[in-house]
């Protein structure tokens, strides 16, 4: 038995997402978040989004085949899947918390708005413009290529999973995007074009499928939020080079 499906869940809206949107709208340089990135919790809306996600997972019968759960160590991702499983009345499957699934590290640019990056770190902004989003690594942080490298390592473990047909990954928008890029073998231009026209919404569901071990992965669904009919849909992503948002 081999993993045939990967279901990717982005965490619900976080309090840092809310603070970042507020800081951007106010034209501020810095985002006021009293947590380190790993400890950022969900917002009240994020909790509601997670409950709606849980009902969707139950409706889709996520546990109708053997399931394994991989989770980012960051609080917002863990809260999302815990709330979702409880809301859907689902039993927690075999779980692994894996640091390779953490969000992208922004280094000196963390908690800066886009304006703040330009005002306080103009050299980093010039480097980003020159290198491009895929290769730019802010001081003390990671490039998209760095995130992709650690996710290649994690995905190499997929074929070593025993007794599992469906892998559920609860993590972050950068992780969802990079897992899709690795599975579909997207190069830099293809990934940048895909990211330009597609955003990973909060509490969204993305699905990849293959026929058997070694077969190519197919993207069956990307950032589905149909289950958020009664909740606000939020993106809070780096789609417009707004790289600060958690």
Task: Give the predicted meaning of each segment.
Residues 1-6, 90-92, 104-116, 181-246:
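Acidic, low-complexity terminal tails and accessory targeting/binding regions
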Residues 2-9, 15-92, 120:
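Active-site-proximal alpha-helix that buttresses catalytic centers in soluble enzyme cores
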Residues 6, 67, 165-171:
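Generic beta-sheet signal
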Residues 11-12, 71-75, 100, 169-174, ...:
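Short, well-ordered beta-to-alpha junction loops that form the rim of enzyme active sites
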Residues 15, 76-78, 103-104, 175-177:
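Short, active-site-adjacent cap segments at secondary-structure transitions
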Residues 33-41, 125-145:
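Short glycine/proline- and acidic residue-enriched helix-loop micro-motifs
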Residues 60-65, 158-165:
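Glycine-rich phosphate-binding loop signature in dinucleotide/nucleotide-binding domains
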Residues 137-160:
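Internal catalytic-core helix/loop-beta-alpha segment
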């Amino acid at each position: 038995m081999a993993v045939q499906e990967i279901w990717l869940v982005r965490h619900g809206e976080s309090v840092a997402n809310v603070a970042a949107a507020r800081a951007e709208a106010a034209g501020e340089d810095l985002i006021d978040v009293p947590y380190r990135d790993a400890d950022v919790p969900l917002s009240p809306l994020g909790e509601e989004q997670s409950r709606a996600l849980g009902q969707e997972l139950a409706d889709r019968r996520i546990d109708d085949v053997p399931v394994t759960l991989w989770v980012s160590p960051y609080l917002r991702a863990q809260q999302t899947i815990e709330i979702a499983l409880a809301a859907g009345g689902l039993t927690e499957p075999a779980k692994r918390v894996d640091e390779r699934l953490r969000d992208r590290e922004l280094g000196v640019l963390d908690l800066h708005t886009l304006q703040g990056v330009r005002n306080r770190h103009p050299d980093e902004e010039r480097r980003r413009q020159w290198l491009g989003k895929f290769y730019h690594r802010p001081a003390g942080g990671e490039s998209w290529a760095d995130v992709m490298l650690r996710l290649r390592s994690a995905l190499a473990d997929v074929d070593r999973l025993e007794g599992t047909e469906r892998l559920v990954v609860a993590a972050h928008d950068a992780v969802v995007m990079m897992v899709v890029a690795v599975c579909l073998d997207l190069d830099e231009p293809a990934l940048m074009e895909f990211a330009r026209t597609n955003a990973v919404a909060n509490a969204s569901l993305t699905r990849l499928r293959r026929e058997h071990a070694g077969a190519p992965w197919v993207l069956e669904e990307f950032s589905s939020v149909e289950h958020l009919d009664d909740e606000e849909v939020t993106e809070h992503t780096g789609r417009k080079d707004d790289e600060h948002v958690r």
